[in-house]
Amino acid sequence: CIDGKLQPNATYELNGNIYTTDDNERIISCEARPIRSPENPRENEAQLQAGGADRRPNDQGGHIVGRDMNGDSGIGNLVAMDSKINQSDYKRMENDIKSTLDEGKDVTTKTEITYNDVSQRPDKIIVTVIADEKGTIYKFDNNLDNSLKNETPENEKEIIQDRLNETNGTISSIKEEYDKENNLVETTVYITYKNEDGTNYRTSVIIEN
């Protein structure tokens, strides 16, 4: 960062985690080795700046690597995340990682972030977590527009669509679990919806392969 801004086409290191930006100064990837750590203090100003002019009212500054897993607090580890993603789906993934770390296993993650055109706000975040030679891929829809429907298992699309119709919800994330031979073992599709009083709820469809 120079004067609080990320630089274009740069690779930089924060707390041992490696980040890459594109020619629009946006973080597009992060390779990390999360560890349990004291929670780094928040940088509220940096969190409020994430997404710039493309930030939406429901967005928060979401840490790519959690502050309690040796993730930096500043703008180099932040993207604009919809609050439903940041506080639920992404947090669920972080809790999965922390549980794995608590089992004494080494964990590595690779995060890939995609954007629409020149927007500073991500459309999709994909995190590949490797632990015990097994991979888990988490896909997050930051727009909550059901664009992940195309990535659900073909044989269960009807069941997933029925659940979407019942709840009037959207697919907020997908979790794919693989074995050591990289065979897909289980897919969990998470659906976010509101009830009549406006409270957010989540439900899921689990598909075994």
What positions do the PLM features span?
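Domain-level detector of nuclease and nuclease-like folds
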Residues: 5-196, 200-207
